């Protein structure tokens, strides 16, 4: 899986509705009004920018500028990690889990303990997580997912996480995770075409 596409999907899943509206406003001079009207998610917008060669794997200046305008320092940190090589160093399956973790953290709040119990996180571990993050539900979710992943090691998978979500009746979140995997796969399948078109256009005299 292309780590850059994984990064874009991760960023998209963490954008609020207001964030998306602001991004569309910021891109109004780069993207036609017709295309912007079709944009329903951050990934939609990133895909358009990729197609127009305004955004490339090796040139993330525009992406950094957009995230800075949103004042989303957390997302800028993800971009920093990617550029530092953290994302590309991830083993197979790690990138898929990272996307799933981001979605779960953004959409599971007060039900985090129910999910943690289903993932076999001990009560003692949960108590420690609560003490460590007394004010952040999303960080509690992320920490509990890390505990599960560390315990499962190579057996930790998106499929296992989705199964736990559905057992907890968090079906909407499970659907979002599955849709994210499908969307990343489709984007990845399209990426060679984008690369070929980029090369062709650059070779045209």
From Swiss-Prot:
Tell me where in this chain the PTM Phosphoserine is found.
191
Subcellular localization, per the record? Cytoplasm
This protein's name: FAS-associated death domain protein
The record, for InterPro entries, names: DEATH-like_dom_sf, Death_dom, DED_dom, FADD, FADD_vert
Taxon lineage: Eukaryota, Metazoa, Chordata, Craniata, Vertebrata
Task: Establish whether keyword Phosphoprotein is in the entry.
Answer: yes
One GO cellular component term, please give it: cell body
Organism's domain of life?
A: Eukaryota
């Amino acid at each position: 899986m292309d780590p850059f596409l994984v990064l874009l999907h991760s960023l998209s899943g963490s954008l609020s509705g207001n964030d998306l509206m602001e991004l569309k406003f910021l891109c109004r001079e780069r993207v036609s009004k017709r295309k912007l009207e079709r944009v329903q998610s951050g990934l939609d917008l990133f895909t358009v920018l990729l197609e127009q060669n305004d955004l490339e794997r090796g040139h993330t200046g525009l992406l950094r500028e957009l995230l800075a305008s949103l004042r989303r320092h957390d997302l800028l940190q993800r971009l920093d990690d990617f550029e530092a090589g953290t994302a590309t160093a991830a083993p197979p399956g790690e990138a898929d889990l990272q996307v799933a973790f981001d979605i779960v953290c953004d959409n599971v709040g007060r039900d985090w303990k129910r999910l943690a119990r289903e993932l076999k996180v001990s009560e003692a571990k949960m108590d420690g997580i609560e003490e460590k993050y007394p004010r952040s539900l999303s960080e509690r979710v992320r920490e509990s997912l890390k505990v599960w992943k560390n315990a499962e090691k190579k057996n930790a998978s998106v499929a296992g996480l989705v199964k736990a979500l559905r057992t907890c009746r968090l079906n909407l979140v499970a659907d979002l995770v599955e849709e994210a995997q499908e969307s990343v796969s489709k984007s990845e399948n399209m990426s060679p075409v984008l690369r070929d078109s980029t090369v062709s256009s650059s070779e045209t005299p």
